[in-house]
A protein has these predicted regions:
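Ferredoxin-type iron-sulfur electron-transfer modules and their immediate structural context
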Residues: 488-642, 649-693
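Glycine-/acidic-rich phosphate or pyrophosphate-binding loops and their flanking alpha/beta elements
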Residues: 146-169, 299-313, 568-569, 620-625
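Conserved thiamine diphosphate
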Residues: 19-71, 95-96, 243, 247-260, ...
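Structural signature of the thiamine diphosphate
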Residues: 40-100, 263-303, 497-519
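Active-site cofactor/cluster-binding pocket
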Residues: 204-208, 217-220, 224-235, 239, ...
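Conformationally flexible catalytic loops at phosphate/diphosphate-handling active centers
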Residues: 65-160
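Short acidic, glycine/serine/threonine-rich loops at helix termini
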Residues: 16-22, 49-53, 76-83, 87, ...
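Thiamine diphosphate
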Residues: 31, 142-290, 363-365, 380-382, ...
């Protein structure tokens, strides 16, 4: 296929047993036979630079280019890069070749045919005739890389090698090269002799350039693919390397492994495990890493996180929830840092499958050197929890360094309240890590100034105060200017609310002295499952608490099969305010239940016996409608499923629902919901006999 074209692809999973929107290379690998050249970038800076290389190469080679980079991991990352000015691009642009390409466009003044039908006697010849273009392509792509280097100072090769000149073990990889590169530099300082080849041009695969990249001292090679081809003897890059080394008649032990399927994190500790595998007399081949394969035993074990980053790099984790502004504020914080300091910065956020109110975990790194660490923060200097309900659900302090800062957004400002409400595992970890512990009721501050759940500016101010990355006390003024710039289009009132939130934030920040007694606390009480909970959920519940990485392969069912109706056991408890029903105002229109997207506020009918058994707080009124005589009516919310969206209260025609602070009524309404779930089904109710629900 000869046609000058370029597409830039954020590579994603071609879903198998379940849907996934995260990173993998299976979609790119499905295009291998199309005749398109395939180019890989390993970080944000490379994605910027090689995008230009791809366009230049397409023009000079007459081959279409697919330029890809890791979806989500790189495509959704915010990082500081050096942009190429347009005037510099103009200096190396091949105008003559581009004009020649334009002349080949379909035009009635000089027509020709494309996409014709060919019979068996001539089709094959027409396939082979294009081979010279593919043979010449690698050198032309390298020439394009050299041209880009002439205006940027950043030199790329088809296969970029980093490591010891006399390396005996080498990893070959696409997409995760900078993480491997970071680990290689660390291991070589420890006395190892290892290296990495970052593949940039996967198609056409150049034997000559690959041979030049592999050190002559190399005895063993580990090829890492970010995809899995069931039934194949190996994955695509591995098979290419095996064939190439065989054709070059170079002797080396070659093994393949699979990394990062479905967006699974790939860390320096895993890189070290791959190198350690090559040291064995018989290295494991076609292994997986990042999971515990206790079924086929193909996985490699790996150790604790490695300190591969420079000491000056500050790493932070922000546990937020969808719609609270945490993700946006971390991105803005990174931009403020880069614009107003000499630091480089990186931000990347992880999301769950929920929309508003879902879990978000934002990872931020700040350092003097460019940051190319394409994995989640593992050793944090600063951890912030923006939702108090997370304290009991997640192990947020696991990644905190000893002596690091932990900030909690909660209504518990005294040690007595924290003692009562925090789980033992969190208190024990804070004490053992000698953490600097701060608490702020950011939600109350936001509500007091009219921002409802938007705590982003409050927590951003706390971050810059406790981590003075921006020197000279300039952060407050910069934040105020940022508020005006970001929210100016929404009106003066919104700007004033955010400025007031900034002013009040630090006055509500409290330093907590962690009691020494917390260090010896026992474990929390074991989880008690409701009667009837399926075994499937009991087995896989760690996935609900961001601990799915701990689950071995044997816990899963082939084909991704699972029981229906398991969401009722999740009970996220993320609401800050929930609707409380006023029976006297309610007209029983049921609009609230119709509009609730989470189906967590519902109408209930009670017979006389159920009314008698109801808790004192479970008030009800006679139901409207002839067919409902003798029954009582109640609107009840599931406090633990509510997301505080307020749609029900806003749309109630008689204002019968009042959004009330969760901590005031949450426990009461949860018990009311439990009773509501025991009520009997009253059967099908005729539309003419009661107020319509739809």
């Amino acid at each position: 296929m000869l046609f000058r074209s370029v597409i830039h692809v954020a590579s994603r999973v071609v879903s198998k047993q379940a849907l996934s929107l995260l990173c993998e290379h299976s979609d790119v690998m499905a295009t291998r036979q199309t005749g398109w050249a395939i180019m890989s970038s390993h970080c944000v800076q490379e994605a910027h630079d090689l995008a230009l290389v791809a366009h230049l190469s397409a023009i000079t080679t007459s081959i279409p280019f697919l330029h890809f980079f890791d979806g989500w991991r790189i495509s959704h990352e915010v990082n500081s890069i050096n942009r190429i000015p347009c005037e510099e691009v103009a200096k190396i642009y091949p105008y003559e070749a581009a004009n020649d390409f334009r002349k080949r466009a379909l035009n009635p003044n000089h027509p020709y045919q494309r996409g014709i039908a060919q019979s068996q006697d001539i089709y094959m010849q027409n396939c082979v005739v294009a081979q010279p273009f593919y043979d010449a392509a690698p050198d032309k792509v390298q020439a394009a890389m050299d041209k880009v280097a002439s205006i940027t100072g950043r030199q790329y090769h088809l296969f970029d090698y980093t490591g010891a000149k006399d390396a005996d073990r080498v990893i070959v990889v696409m997409g995760a090269g900078t993480t491997v590169e970071e680990t290689v530099n660390y291991l070589n300082k420890q006395g190892e002799k290892v290296g990495v080849v970052k593949v940039h041009l996967f198609r056409p695969f150049s034997r000559k350039h690959f041979d030049a990249a592999i050190p002559k001292t190399c005895k063993s090679i580990c090829v890492l693919d970010r995809c899995r081809e069931d039934g194949a003897p190996g994955e695509p890059l591995y098979l290419d390397v095996v064939a190439t080394m065989n054709q070059l008649k170079r002797n080396a032990t070659i093994v393949g492994g699979q990394i990062g399927l479905g967006g699974k994190d790939f860390t320096p500790a895993m890189v070290k495990a791959c190198f350690d595998n090559l040291n064995k007399p018989e290295p494991k081949n076609r292994f997986v890493i990042g999971v515990n394969d206790d079924v086929c035993h193909t996985s490699l074990p790996y150790g604790a996180p490695l300190p591969t980053l420079p000491e000056d790099v500050k790493q932070c984790i922000f546990w937020g929830y969808g719609s609270d502004g945490t993700v946006g504020s971390t991105h803005d914080a990174v931009k403020l840092i880069v614009k107003n300091t000499d630091f480089n910065a990186q931000a990347y956020s992880v999301y769950d499958a929920h929309k508003s109110g879902g879990l978000t975990v934002s990872h931020v790194r700040v350092g003097k050197e460019p940051i190319r660490s394409e994995y989640l923060v593992q050793q944090a200097d600063y951890v912030a929890c923006h939702n108090s309900t997370y304290a009991r659900k997640f192990h947020m302090v696991n990644q905190l360094k000893e002596g690091g800062i932990f900030v909690l957004n909660s209504p518990w400002n005294t040690i007595e309240e924290l003692e009562k409400n925090l789980p033992n595992h969190l208190k024990r970890d804070l004490a053992n890590k000698k953490a600097q512990f701060y608490n702020i009721d950011a939600t109350a501050v936001a509500q007091s100034v009219g921002l409802k759940q938007r705590i982003n500016m409050i927590m951003q101010n706390v971050f810059f105060t406790l981590c003075p990355i921006i020197p000279g006390g300039r952060a407050p003024k910069l934040l105020e200017a940022d508020v005006s710039a970001r929210f100016g289009s929404k009106g003066k009132e919104v700007v004033e609310m955010n400025l007031n939130a900034l002013k009040q934030s630090l006055a509500n920040l409290h330093k907590i002295d962690v009691p020494a007694s917390w260090a010896t606390l026992g474990d929390d009480a074991p989880r008690v499952w409701p009667e009837g909970t399926p075994e499937f959920l009991k087995t896989l519940y760690p996935a609900l608490y961001s601990e799915g990485d701990t689950l071995p392969v044997s816990k899963f069912v082939v084909g991704g099969v699972q029981p229906a109706g398991t969401s009722k056991y999740e009970k996220r408890g993320i609401a800050t305010v929930i609707p409380v029903w006023d029976a006297e105002k309610c007209t029983q229109c049921n609009q609230c239940a119709t509009l609730c997207t989470h189906v967590c506020i519902r109408p209930f009918l009670l017979d006389a016996e159920e009314v008698k058994k109801a808790p004192a707080t479970f008030k009800s009124v006679p139901a409207v409608g002839d067919e409902l005589k003798g029954l009582n009516f109640r609107i009840q919310v599931s406090a633990m499923d509510c997301s505080s969206c307020e749609v029900c209260a806003v749309n109630c025609p008689t204002n019968a629902l009042t959004m009330t602070n969760f901590r005031e009524v949450g426990e009461r309404e949860s018990k009311n919901w439990e009773y509501a779930m025991t009520l009997t089904n009253k059967g099908k109710i005729g539309r003419a006999s009661c107020r319509e629900r739809v």
